[in-house]
Amino acid sequence: MTFQKSTVVPAAEGRVKIDKDDNGNYSVNVKVNNLAKPSRLQPERKLYVVWMETENNGIKNLGRLKSSSGFFSDDLEGSLSTISPFKAKRVFITAENESNLQYPGSIVVLSTSDFN
């Protein structure tokens, strides 16, 4: 599934792939291109966090979006691969100052539509 067009970072585009494994867990793979450095946003932020809205368990922090260099460099690409026991309703990315948050901030950079 692709992310919808962003009003915060219009050039950004990306995909989310979710597969259910033999143990009933979900493999979540996120890839994003043309994402601005979070320090260039208004207000300025330090990093991007990937979130998953689940069907029955609220919103879960999946982790920090990482680039190949560890920080957002000139390639402006990011990715995240993780496992979740929860079924996704949608996935979205926020700009934050910390990665270990329980709830997303208000700056939603990219979001999928609801999964069927």
Predicted segments with their positions:
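N-terminal targeting/export leaders
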Residues: 1-116
